[in-house]
């Protein structure tokens, strides 16, 4: 196949889609490029074998190569390893809008691989990868009801930005990624700075409109390639069997869905499913048990959906707008820095906040460069939370995705590092789950942080919305259950403060979501969020004024940049000595910000005192309590500050020159001295304030001699190591 190229004007960028030159043995391969960022996306699918599957085995792998930015991977193994969290999140970003566009009952294996080959740091590769995946699917011959487009939308000074650069993203109040077909929005992922529902809805509509030009070009590319799609037909539905299942099981299934307790309801439905399969196989042993089970599931779906559309109570007895009962316990765990047990219906999370110092920040080394993450949120979904057994270990894609959503919801309200210099780690342990565990994590995180004394700008709550739609009839549901998510048409999660939205995630399984439906969903989400915030405020309205007794303390100091060398010392000796003597962790950056970190408040104060002494300057006219550090023939060196000595001349010590200094002073003795002067070379002249009066008179009568060392004496002292060198200071 000859090379085919499409160029698309996409905001301020030119998007190029190419096929026919690279990876020609894949079913579909597209090189997608934008301003120096190039992503190769390939699609391969099995033409048979789907009959043996009872699910759709779609795999999306997004991978970043370090050579794309001219870097060699760090660490011992100099090659790319397991996917980073960012790669996992972008894989999910590609997967979510395309998965609903494959036909029902299409179970053939499909694999999509998106590889970043070249990166312009100012152009994010995620949108390019999503568009490339859509184009590769469209030319692969796989049954796919696309193409889709994708766009990133920012918001600054009242204006929406299409595909903003990295620099523009930093100044934007919104980071929204949207994907959809030319007729419908399918997926939204966003982080916002407390924006209103109207602004968020406007951003979605703007992004959807802007991506239509991309969709049109992908359709043209597919026509130019001209690959015919195989005739694929879904298995014919056995209407006779479907009617028979309805006759045998409907009444019992309807009764089962009146059971409000999830585990009891599931147990009863499992019994009914097995009874139905056994009864029908007894009537006709040629029937397939899996087919019967699938049709039984369709019956469940029909019953739940029709009840809701008819205005009947939901599975747990609620109306469409009611939030499940909420209970909250802060300070749930005794020895943690902050904790919360958040329960909403049959969804429950233990959320724990831990405070650390700058060394605890997560180092992220990706192709975009190294950075440090001061706020980590880890979401765990153990199998016991849904009454199942399963593997426990590394987080799965879903756990990484849910944790990222909850983290985004809190980013807008975190205090500035200068105001609260702690590194924060949140762990959310989902202990029960029946829908919306990520939003329970958002609420629990807000409460756990405030319980730990973190001064959030405002509390944050989240709620998951659902949709049931048949033709022109629809119902928007607040705070959906797991069954309502599974059997419904939309999962729409909204988090925010009383002021506005901080995070939004939407996945839609059908086309035809109107502006009216979206507006109602946002309005109900605001109502639900406001209710939840009220319950949260009753439990803990503001952050605690005192940190937990188990939490470490951080003190931050600012020193002059020319004092950094003094604190560190030669070869790091001074700062190491401070750390060893006080037990305090000490960090200092190039701008002179010193961070002291310790669970011991007294140790923290001592370290701060010693650092202040280290950088203090000796002042003329001031009195110091000094210690005799060395006695010489012509006087005594008195240590005034760490690393800083002054000379108390023999004339200030002895009554006459026949008396020895050792007869009056001993090394280690503490005396009060007065700084009489400092010469141009930095040498300090001292006077002894409290020496006996008789000695004072004799000194006054004594001939005035050089109070400072002669040049010969000074050289001798420096050479013999008796005076502190500048490096040691």
Curated annotation (Swiss-Prot):
Task: State the needed cofactors, names only.
Answer: Mg(2+)
Q: Which keywords accompany this UniProt record? A: Cytoplasm, Magnesium, Metal-binding, Nucleotidyltransferase, RNA-binding, Transferase
The Enzyme Commission number assigned here is 2.7.7.8
In its keyword annotation, does this UniProt entry include Isomerase?
Answer: no
SUPFAM superfamilies from the UniProt entry: Eukaryotic type KH-domain (KH-domain type I) (SSF54791), Nucleic acid-binding proteins (SSF50249), Ribonuclease PH domain 2-like (SSF55666), Ribosomal protein S5 domain 2-like (SSF54211)
Tell me where it mainly resides. cytoplasm
Q: Where is the S1 motif domain?
A: 621-689
For this protein, the record's CDD domains field holds: KH-I_PNPase, RNase_PH_PNPase_1, RNase_PH_PNPase_2, S1_PNPase
InterPro entries on file: ExoRNase_PH_dom1, ExoRNase_PH_dom2, ExoRNase_PH_dom2_sf, KH_dom, KH_dom_type_1, KH_dom_type_1_sf, NA-bd_OB-fold, PNPase
Ranges of residues in domain KH = 552-611
Q: Is Metal-binding a UniProt keyword of this protein?
A: yes
Identify the enzyme class. transferase
Catalyses which reaction(s): RNA(n+1) + phosphate = RNA(n) + a ribonucleoside 5'-diphosphate
GO MF terms listed in the record are:
3'-5'-RNA exonuclease activity; magnesium ion binding; polyribonucleotide nucleotidyltransferase activity; RNA binding
Provide GO CC annotations from the record: cytosol
Q: Kindly list the positions annotated as binding Mg(2+).
A: 485, 491
Spell out the subunit comment.
Component of the RNA degradosome, which is a multiprotein complex involved in RNA processing and mRNA degradation.
PANTHER family in alphabetical order: POLYRIBONUCLEOTIDE NUCLEOTIDYLTRANSFERASE, POLYRIBONUCLEOTIDE NUCLEOTIDYLTRANSFERASE 1, MITOCHONDRIAL
Family the UniProt entry places it in: Belongs to the polyribonucleotide nucleotidyltransferase family.
Its function, per the record, reads: Involved in mRNA degradation. Catalyzes the phosphorolysis of single-stranded polyribonucleotides processively in the 3'- to 5'-direction.
By what name is this protein known? Polyribonucleotide nucleotidyltransferase
Highest lineage ranks of the organism? Bacteria, Pseudomonadati, Pseudomonadota, Gammaproteobacteria, Legionellales
Gene transcribed to yield this protein: pnp
């Amino acid at each position: 196949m000859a090379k085919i190229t499409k160029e698309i004007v996409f905001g301020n960028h030119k998007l190029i889609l190419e096929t026919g030159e690279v990876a020609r043995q894949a079913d579909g391969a597209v090189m997608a490029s934008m301003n120096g960022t190039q992503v190769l996306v390939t699609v391969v699918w099995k033409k048979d074998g789907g009959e043996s599957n009872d699910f759709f085995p779609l795999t999306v792998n997004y991978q970043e190569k370090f050579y794309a930015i001219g870097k060699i991977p760090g660490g011992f193994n100099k090659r790319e390893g397991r996917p980073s969290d960012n790669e996992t999140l972008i894989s999910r970003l590609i997967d979510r809008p395309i998965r609903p566009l494959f036909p029902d009952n299409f179970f053939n294996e499909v694999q999509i691989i998106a590889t970043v080959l070249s990166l312009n740091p100012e152009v994010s590769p995620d949108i390019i990868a999503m568009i490339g995946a859509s184009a590769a699917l469209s030319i692969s011959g796989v049954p796919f009801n696309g193409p889709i487009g994708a766009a990133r939308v920012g918001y600054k000074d009242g204006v929406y930005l299409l595909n903003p650069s990295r620099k523009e993203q930093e100044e934007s109040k919104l980071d929204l990624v949207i994907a959809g077909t030319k007729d419908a929005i399918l997926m939204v992922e966003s982080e916002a700075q407390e924006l209103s529902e109207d602004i968020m809805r406007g951003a979605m509509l703007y992004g959807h409109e802007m991506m239509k030009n991309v969709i049109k070009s992908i359709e043209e590319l597919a026509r130019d390639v001209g690959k015919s799609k195989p005739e694929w037909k879904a298995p014919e539905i056995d209407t006779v069997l479907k009617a028979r299942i309805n006759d045998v099981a409907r009444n019992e299934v309807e009764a089962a869905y009146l059971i409000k307790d999830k585990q009891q309801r599931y147990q009863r439905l499992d019994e009914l499913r097995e009874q139905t399969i056994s009864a029908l196989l007894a009537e006709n042993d040629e029937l397939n048990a899996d087919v019967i089970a699938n049709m039984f599931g369709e019956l469940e779906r029909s019953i739940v959906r029709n009840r809701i559309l008819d205005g009947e109570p939901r599975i747990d007895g609620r109306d469409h707008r009611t939030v499940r009962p909420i209970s909250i316990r802060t300070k749930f765990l005794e020895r943690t820095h902050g904790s919360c047990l958040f329960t909403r219906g049959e969804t429950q999370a233990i959320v724990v906040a831990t405070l650390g110092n700058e060394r605890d920040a997560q180092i992220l080394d990706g192709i975009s460069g190294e950075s440090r993450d001061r706020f980590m949120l880890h979401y765990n979904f153990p199998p016991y939370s849904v009454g199942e057994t399963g593997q426990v270990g590394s987080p799965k894609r879903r756990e990484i995705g849910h944790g990222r959503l909850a983290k985004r919801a809190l980013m807008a309200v975190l205090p500035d590092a200068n105001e609260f210099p702690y590194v924060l780690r949140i762990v959310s342990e989902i202990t029960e789950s029946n829908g919306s565990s990520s939003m329970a994590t958002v609420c629990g995180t807000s409460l756990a942080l405030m319980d730990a004394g973190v001064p959030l700008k405002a509390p944050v709550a989240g709620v998951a919305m659902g949709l049931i739609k048949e033709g022109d009839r629809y119902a928007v549901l607040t705070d959906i259950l797991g069954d309502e998510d599974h059997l419904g048409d939309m999962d729409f999660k909204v988090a925010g403060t009383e002021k506005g939205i901080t995070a939004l995630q939407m996945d839609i399984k059908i086309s035809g979501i109107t502006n009216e439906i979206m507006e109602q969903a946002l309005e109900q989400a605001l109502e639900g969020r406001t209710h939840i915030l009220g319950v949260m405020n009753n439990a803990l309205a503001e952050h605690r004024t005192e940190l937990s007794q188990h939490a470490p303390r951080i003190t931050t100091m600012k020193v002059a940049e020319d004092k950094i060398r003094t604190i560190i010392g030669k070869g790091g000796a001074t700062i190491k000595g401070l750390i060893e003597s006080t037990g305090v962790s000490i960090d200092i950056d190039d701008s002179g910000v010193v961070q002291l970190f310790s669970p011991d408040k007294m140790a923290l104060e001592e370290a701060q005192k010693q650092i202040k002494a280290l950088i203090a300057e000796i002042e003329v006219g001031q009195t110091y309590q000094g210690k005799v550090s060395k006695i010489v023939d012509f006087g005594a060196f008195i240590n005034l500050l760490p690393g800083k000595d002054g000379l108390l001349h023999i004339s200030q010590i002895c009554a006459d020159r026949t008396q020895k200094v050792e007869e009056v002073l001993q090394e280690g003795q503490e005396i009060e001295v007065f700084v009489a002067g400092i010469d141009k070379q930095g040498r300090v002249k001292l006077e002894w304030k409290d020496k006996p009066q008789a000695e004072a008179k004799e000194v006054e009568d004594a001939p005035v001699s050089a109070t400072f060392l002669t040049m010969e004496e000074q050289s001798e002292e420096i050479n013999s190591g008796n005076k502190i060198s500048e490096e040691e200071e």
